[in-house]
Amino acid sequence: MSIDQRLQLITRNAAEIITIDELRKKIESEEKLKGYIGFEPSGLFHIGWLIWTQKVKDLVEAGVNMTLLRATWHAWINDKLGGDLSLIKMAADYTVEVIKNYGVDTTKLNIVDADDMVKEKDYWALVIKVAKNASLARIKRALTIMGRRAEEAEIDASKLIYPAMQVSDIFYLDLDIALGGTDQRKAHMLARDVAEKMGKKKIVSIHTPLLVGLQGGQRMSITEGMEEDDIQAEIKMSKSKPESAIFVSDSREDVERKIMGAYCPKGVAENNPILQILKYIIFPRYNFVKIERDIRYGGDVEFKDYEELERAYIEGKIHPMDLKKATARRLNEILEPIRKSLERKPEFEEMIQKISKSVTR
């Protein structure tokens, strides 16, 4: 694979690369690059997470040594799943199973458990050094990486450790690339700034889009003056709002029902969850999408790239109901092997039931 091909694959569908020039230089160096993504095992796996899962797949195919960090302690600090560490670890196992059955070659991943990292004294020394090189105000601003606001920092003091831990994860693993959703931007920028002060390697940050919830960009908690990445974090698909999310374990019928009831105004692309599912989840897996229609309405039509489909939708050439039916059909094809894998393992069925009863924001 050429340098340009690797760069194209790595950057495909990314919302932001910080910076593209640094990434190109790293690829051109021909050194074996190390990347990572850390995930909080915080509940059921919804399709929004398939966006970064696909990017992990892209990075592996581009020759990057990827680490998957099971951020169990981070989830515990963030009060996920009621702070039940055993349930959090169960959710981590479940997440890895989903990633595997999505098509990521997990034998090529370095899977690291935060439980092992926190046993090392060098790790905690690094956390303190990072904290010493960051202002309290900067740490509090970074709390949005946890899905929390700066004013919530008074809930308990452990929350203030979280951003320093995330930066320390990056340094401890000696990474070249940090992958995350746009909601992780503040942590990655903190890591880049602190790296200069501590003489550490400065990471390239790859930020994937956050899939908007099925209700579209309609959240009462959006206020004037909010930064763009914080706005996107507010309207994203959330496991704590089951009707706004599609879970990989949802039945075919539930997927169809949720898709058919989703926000999808005629001719509108902005914050349209159906179009986003097509762009970020379906088109990266398929060479075309077929819209089936009655001959009275023009008959079937195929689109070989997302831009062509979006253009036709904005121009009113595709009806929302036809778009939804095609999306549900393709999405169920992607989810079917994941569903079957989970069904073959009774322990995951029990896990899903437990997690469903324990999901917290």
From Swiss-Prot:
L-tyrosine binds at residues 36, 162, 166, 169, 184. GO terms for molecular function: ATP binding; tyrosine-tRNA ligase activity. SUPFAM superfamilies: Nucleotidylyl transferase. The keyword Nucleotide-binding applies. It is an enzyme of class 6 (ligase). ATP binds at residue 239. A motif ('KMSKS' region) lies at residues 236-240. Keywords: Aminoacyl-tRNA synthetase, ATP-binding, Cytoplasm, Ligase, Nucleotide-binding, Protein biosynthesis. Pfam families: tRNA-synt_1b (PF00579). It is found in: Cytoplasm. Homodimer. HAMAP family: Tyr_tRNA_synth_type4. This is Tyrosine--tRNA ligase.
